[in-house]
From Swiss-Prot:
Physiological role: Forms an icosahedral capsid with a T=7 symmetry and a 40 nm diameter. The capsid is composed of 72 pentamers linked to each other by disulfide bonds and associated with VP2 or VP3 proteins. Interacts with terminal alpha(2,3)-linked sialic acids on the cell surface to provide virion attachment to target cell. This attachment induces virion internalization predominantly through caveolin-mediated endocytosis. Once attached, the virion is internalized by caveolin-mediated endocytosis and traffics to the endoplasmic reticulum.
Region (C-terminal arm): 322-384
Leftover remarks: The virus attaches to the surface of cells by recognition of oligosaccharides terminating in alpha(2,3)-linked sialic acid. Strains that have Gly-92 (small-plaque strains) can also recognize branched oligosaccharides that carry a second alpha(2,6)-linked sialic acid.
Free-text note on domains in this protein's UniProt record: A DNA-binding domain overlapping a bipartite nuclear localization signal is present in the N-terminal region of the protein and is required for efficient virus formation.
MF terms (GO), sorted A to Z: structural molecule activity
Lineage: Viruses, Monodnaviria, Shotokuvirae, Cossaviricota, Papovaviricetes
Keyword presence, Kinase: no
Protein name in UniProt: Major capsid protein VP1
Post-translational modification Phosphothreonine, affected residues: T358
Length: 384
């Protein structure tokens, strides 16, 4: 008898018992820096690079340029003056290193601001380094000699406390005020102090974190580094990086290369959005101090910083509705007046009545009626 062919389906076949899992959907719409972030703009002109540098602001301004009338101190501070007592500490403004900052204007992207979506520049990455570290090898100047007895050896190089911070953002850097001693008397002419912002003398809370002592880095060479620090509670639209090395004889340590790129994107893949077609750069680079030979006076030394920023275009939802633009236009046409206070703590407004719809005539028109915070109508009955 001939062999019978086996019937049925091959046993090697396996059926999928259940559907394959699908990736869970994730939110595409992000709100970043006050903007609703949409897709990227693609194309040959959607990426641009900008190179710039910031010079140090150690206390001595760029002018005068004469090397005999103060220009020789550019890049340095003037001699640091010590306090005579705990209650008499008044440093000179030209001895205080301050923040360097600048705003780079970017090409305009939107001719029509009435559209639902707008294009905006987004900072993607930055290459940066401190320039001029080789100048610290100068050991033949008129500084304090290493052999103080015979005035021989070499000139003491720059050394001491070092502070390096740089920031790239779509808005000015947010700063938090914090000082070592609230009794310090900073001069308000020429620099921005905590008293300049709060209009009050410093208090003990300014030696820790005082929530009201905040500012924005909106002026170059005006915000002392020992007073103003990057605010970690803000700066959502800014990236900052920094390090500090303390000590009276700490040697400067610097690494420099043109191959290191710092990515500015956050965990959602979005970088600082440049509002108003402008990107803001900020930095401080303090290398230490030099000690003069005659009077043992200390001068802070700062170096410039180079930036190369890469930006790309991104679509965002228009944050400026036409109603608000027209409203601000009409409001700006009205004259600005300064009258008596009608808002705030010293308001002179006694009573405000708001009517909505109609109702039967009440028997007691003076009865207090109001709507509470939950939207319910309340009536206060008169007492005896």
């Amino acid at each position: 008898m001939a062999p019978k062919r086996k019937s049925g389906v091959s046993k090697c076949e396996t059926k999928c018992t259940k559907a394959c899992p699908r990736p869970a959907p994730v939110p595409k719409l992000l709100i970043k820096g006050g903007m609703e972030v949409l897709d990227l703009v693609t194309g040959p002109d959607s990426v641009t690079e900008i190179e710039a540098f910031l010079n140090p602001r150690m206390g001595q301004p760029p002018t005068p340029e004469s090397l005999t009338e103060g220009g020789q101190y550019y890049g340095w501070s003037r001699g640091i003056n010590l306090a005579t007592s705990d209650t008499d500490d008044s440093p000179g403004n030209n001895t205080l290193p301050t923040w360097s900052m600048a705003k780079l204007q970017l090409p305009m992207l939107n001719e029509d601001l009435t559209c639902d979506t707008l294009q905006m520049w987004e900072a993607v990455s930055v290459k940066t380094e401190v320039v001029g570290s080789g100048s610290l090898l100068d050991v033949h100047g008129f500084n304090k000699p290493t052999d103080t007895v015979n005035t021989k050896g070499i000139s003491t190089p720059v050394e001491g406390s070092q502070y390096h911070v740089f920031a790239v953002g779509g808005e000015p850097l947010d700063l938090q005020g914090l000082v070592t001693d609230a009794r310090t008397k900073y001069k308000e002419e020429g620099v921005v102090t905590i008293k300049t912002i709060t209009k009050k003398d410093m208090v003990n809370k300014d030696q820790v974190l005082n929530p009201i002592s905040k500012a924005k880095l909106d002026k170059d060479g005006m915000y002392p580094v020992e007073i103003w620090h990057p605010d970690p509670a803000k700066n959502e639209n800014t990236r900052y990086f920094g390090n500090y090395t303390g000590g009276t004889t700490a040697p400067p340590v610097l690494q420099f290369t043109n191959t290191l790129t710092t990515v500015l994107l956050d965990e959602n893949g979005v970088g600082p959005l440049c509002k108003g077609e402008g990107v803001y750069l900020s930095c401080v680079d303090i290398m230490g101090w030099r000690i003069t030979r005659n009077y043992d006076v200390h001068h802070w030394r700062g170096l410039p910083r180079y930036f190369k920023i890469t930006l790309r275009k991104r679509w965002v939802k228009n944050p400026y509705p036409m109603a608000s633009l027209i409203s601000s236009l009409f409001n700006n046409m009205l004259p600005q007046v300064q009258g008596q206070p009608m808002e705030g703590e010293n308001t002179q407004v006694e009573e405000v009545r708001v009517y909505d719809g109609t109702e039967p005539v009440p028997g007691d028109p003076d009865m207090t009626r109001y709507v509470d915070r939950f939207g319910k109508t309340k009536t206060v009955f008169p007492g005896n």
